[in-house]
Regions:
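N-terminal post-signal-peptidase region of extra-cytosolic proteins
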Residues: 53-56, 101-110
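N-terminal secretory targeting modules
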Residues: 1-69, 76-77, 81-92, 115-118, ...
Length: 255
């Protein structure tokens, strides 16, 4: 059957369009996540991440040792290197090469962070980014000028989903309570972590997850180890938190 030149041209156009679409899709997948999350975080390549923070450098496993995964925001980034040093020769301590942000971002990224495993222990926290207030441009603002990123009810529901997935790995799970918010912290309300820790406590009790109460320790030592008007800690403060994290991990690794 003879095909008209017009129909032949249409077939060529359709084939070219489909091929181009496939190539673009493959290219985007190969490139990985490049755009910011709706939760205000933006994944980096490993090279970019490692240039920003020494804690983001990937570690080589010692085969005979158990593998531990730390998941958390900048507070956990601050104690990662100390935990690695304290567990040297006893565990391979890994963490995602990024700030893990809020529970919403965690749901987007958890599969990537878990990777192929296996994990003996997963020590994690979410909270400080959930309870912050942002304006339409993503800037930290007072509560009356913006919206809370993840309201506490959504936070609690997100935690249940995150814990359920982590438990599927077979790892022992430890939740670290969210550390104190001092007066004057940008985009956050002093003491609001208490409401979020209460919600997290309900989830962890129901799902039988161990709790590392970093909040209680940090609150008792707040004037000494935490920066003023800032959720972050001094180097000595991060070292103290690392000691608590290390002990909680060892308690789960010990038969």
């Amino acid at each position: 059957m003879k095909i008209s030149s017009r129909r032949l041209a249409l077939r060529w156009w359709l084939a070219a369009t489909i091929s181009l679409g496939w190539l673009l899709a493959v290219g985007v997948a190969a490139a990985g996540p490049t755009g910011p999350s709706k939760y205000g975080m933006q994944p980096m390549t490993p090279a970019q991440a490692q240039a920003v923070r020494p804690a983001f450098v990937e570690v080589a496993d010692i085969p005979a040792l158990p593998r531990v995964l730390l998941i958390g925001d900048s507070i956990s980034v601050g104690y990662t290197l100390a935990v690695r040093a304290q567990l040297a020769g006893r565990a391979n301590v890994h963490r995602p090469s990024e700030n893990c942000g809020s529970t919403g971002y965690g749901l987007e990224r958890l599969e990537t962070w878990l990777g192929a495993g296996p994990w003996a222990v997963i020590h994690f926290n979410f909270g400080l980014h959930d309870l912050k207030y942002l304006d339409a441009q993503g800037k930290y603002v007072a509560p009356e000028q913006g919206q809370q990123l993840v309201p506490v009810g959504e936070y609690e529901a997100n935690l249940r989903k995150l814990v359920q997935r982590m438990q599927q790995t077979g790892a022992k799970i430890i939740f670290a309570t969210t550390t104190p918010i001092p007066a004057g912290s940008a985009g956050r309300v002093e003491g609001s972590e208490q409401l979020y820790n209460a919600a997290a406590g309900r989830v962890m009790r129901a799902m039988k997850v161990a709790v590392d109460d970093l909040h209680a320790h940090a609150l008792a030592r707040q004037g000494t180890i935490q920066r003023p008007q800032n959720v972050h800690f001094t180097p000595a403060g991060s070292e103290e938190l690392a000691g608590l994290v290390t002990q909680s991990i060892l308690s789960e690794l010990t038969p």
